[in-house]
């Protein structure tokens, strides 16, 4: 490699060197800015501005040199002459623009000292020449030799680069530590594995304050670097197409965080492994991936590395609060420790996955079962409550699955000891002279509690009697509907013939205008009365003979009253529908064996009465399948005289459950034969 120096301006006599210098300066600028971006210093913006200004001066100086000035520089003399003695070295007068010279890095690093250039580089030929165009770049190259401008032989005689041409394909980049130190494919792999010797990012505190690279002594032991989570965005960095920054050299065991990954891919760590790490460095070379043939952008690489599982970071700390150096650990344990951190990070980020068989069950428990005491009571008392719930959940449609918990509670509430306890209180109240609690002038605590107990019994008794009477009301309506259906079927043939004859007579009378008149008749004139509607009308006429509906367009007081009564009658018939289904499925006294809202399972009358018909059918089918035999026996035993006792028509009959202690009923087992014995009369 032939280098020349002019006595006046230290110009270079190769036009291609201008492009080389520009590439090196831009590469140095980008590497330096990326190094700044990996730190979390508060004065990052100020340091960035200073570096940009100094680098801009270098670029302007390099770009201002034209080919004419380069070739016409007089008295060009060699900057480096192999015949010159080693102690005579010309100095460079132009300073680089950085305030401090670059410090020495290590003993193993080729430094710019005295010596002669190796023959391989001197005789590389005209096509492989690499010359410098400006003393500023010479000064940057020779910073370690205190701006002597002397190109050392040790820098170019390294054993790893013997026989390598300057424009060889294997020589694809410059080292980030020393721009005069070539970096081959083999060294790129070794440099990536070398970064694994450091835990976290390097500490750039002293470097930012002096704008120089830190020396080897400051990195003798790993320093707890800053968090990579607060990396500033390099939106103002200028991208150059011919720049080879961010060479992708990714290793599975080394890519652990964003900060170290940026340093790895950009080659920014200005330290050489010491001799104590050389064995580890050589052993780890075999596990490093080959470098990517094309450069990867810094931002795209950062996003890629974050997807691979970056290490969790913390907020950046000020310079005066940073953690000091800590003792270095065994380097062989670093890949294992980092892999464990990545595993923990992936475990925190990865959502729990379950098999398809268990996913439905989890959704049922999380979204369907309400966290109320009645459900907890059912799951705590009954071992098969889970099975019952899942059965209802599977049989119900998607829009009715939220009723599974209610059906599960109702399944155990029918004919339960709690239902018998409430029935005992209702029977006791029905045998008294007055169902209304007696009035007390004094505000006595015992009397107040006694009245409340009596009112609860009154509520239970009223609920049971209401069920009976609702079923009777619906039964009346059903009988009227059946009568209308039978009458309609009886006169169907005669009515059809009569209708046909009347229509023919009407057509003959009206002639041509008959079809037009038939089409203009309103729908109300041709209103068809269904059997249910006519049965409801008959009920209203029987119950309220003095009321009649209003005519069209006329509103009267009697008509409004009729409408209110009709609405109330329809609501009662709707409430009686489900109780009627219970009575048909378990004939007898099943209506008295369903507890009220005061029970442990919290079954209110609204819960049962507002269940859809299809849902109630599913419930009754499963209830009859599982507990049908027991409930049918209990309903038949109580049905003989229960209604008469509740209505106080015959209070002489007594049941065994009335003579049983309340605790005995509460502690009773479900579907136990002893409960059937309590339903018998004395």
UniProtKB/Swiss-Prot annotation:
Residues 63-86, 107-129, 251-358 are annotated as: Disordered. Residues 335-349 have a biased composition (Basic and acidic residues). Residues 257-279, 310-320 have a biased composition (Polar residues). Residues 63-73 have a biased composition (Low complexity). It comes from the Eukaryota. Coiled coil: none annotated. Pneumocandin B0 is the starting molecule for the first semisynthetic echinocandin antifungal drug, caspofungin acetate. Pneumocandin B0 is a minor fermentation product, and its industrial production was achieved by a combination of extensive mutation and medium optimization. Inactivation of three of gloP/GLP450-1, gloO/GLP450-2, and gloM/GLOXY1 generates 13 different pneumocandin analogs that lack one, two, three, or four hydroxyl groups on 4R,5R-dihydroxy-ornithine and 3S,4S-dihydroxy-homotyrosine of the parent hexapeptide. Part of the gene cluster that mediates the biosynthesis of pneumocandins, lipohexapeptides of the echinocandin family that prevent fungal cell wall formation by non-competitive inhibition of beta-1,3-glucan synthase. The 10,12-dimethylmyristoyl side chain is synthesized by the reducing polyketide synthase gloL/GLPKS4. The thioesterase gloN/GLHYD exclusively interacts with gloL/GLPKS4 to maintain turnover of the polyketide side chain. This is Pneumocandin biosynthesis cluster protein B. It comes from Glarea lozoyensis (strain ATCC 20868 / MF5171). The lineage of its organism: Eukaryota, Fungi, Dikarya, Ascomycota, Pezizomycotina.
